[in-house]
Amino acid sequence: MSKNIHDVAYGLQKAIADHTDFKTLKESYAKVQGDADSKQLFDTFRNMQLEIQQKMMQGQEITEEDNKKAQEVIDLIQQNEHIKKLMEAEQRLNVVIGDINKIIMKPLEELYSAYQA
């Protein structure tokens, strides 16, 4: 009898939550939230990201002013140790999730590549 795919997915969810990189991300996020300056800067960064994504999804042009504002916020973020560590932890976790995604998508990749000969 085959495993319930949703049970496997929930197992993967738990494994990610227990993973060292996720725990480091969680700790880093708590430090950002615990420091008023870091929290304000991080919130500004997230809002800016969302605004730019929304513009892109709506087909609106990203203006020079948008780019300048984004670069200013990024420059400030790179000087903030708490946010810098948070972003590094997020990058490490994204690599893990990317690897997992490749593994999950392998059956589809093999299926489609089998008929390209």
From Swiss-Prot:
Question: Record's InterPro entries?
Answer: Com_YlbF, YheA/YmcA-like_dom_sf
Please list which residues make up the signal peptide.
none
Q: What's one Pfam family here?
A: Com_YlbF
Highest taxon, organism lineage: Bacteria
Q: Which residues form a coiled coil?
A: none
Gene3D superfamilies documented for this protein: YheA/YmcA-like
Q: Which cysteines are joined by disulfide bonds?
A: none
| HAMAP family associated with the record | UPF0342
Q: What family is reported?
A: Belongs to the UPF0342 family.
Q: What is this protein called?
A: UPF0342 protein Bcer98_0695
Q: What species is given as this protein's source?
A: Bacillus cytotoxicus (strain DSM 22905 / CIP 110041 / 391-98 / NVH 391-98)
